[in-house]
Amino acid sequence: MVDGMQRANQVINLTPAEVADGLREGRLLLVDVREPNEIAVERYPEAVVVPLSHFDPADIPDPQGKQVVFACRSGRRSVTASLAAQDQGYPYNRHLAGGILAWKAAGLPTETG
């Protein structure tokens, strides 16, 4: 704690395997916060796109009981999105650690084109 100020919000790191399992089991809603030009080249299957450049957590579809998990290219923007959502009162505190780079390194599928 520094000068009585501590950020209450935290972000939980999930591995690519944890996210893939959660998607397969219907427990997670994956939200890709990369920009449209990045997604046009390569994207996560089943992800909802809410670009960080104009991020509003209200734009995320109702997760209907699923846990929201943010994802990006390397894991930095997904942390930013999670913290921004939490700052606005949303309980979205999980992200894909390592982003799509880790996802692909784990041998998980992406869609291209």
Where do the PLM segments sit?
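Rhodanese-like catalytic fold shared by cysteine-dependent sulfurtransferases
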Residues: 1-29, 35-69, 76-113
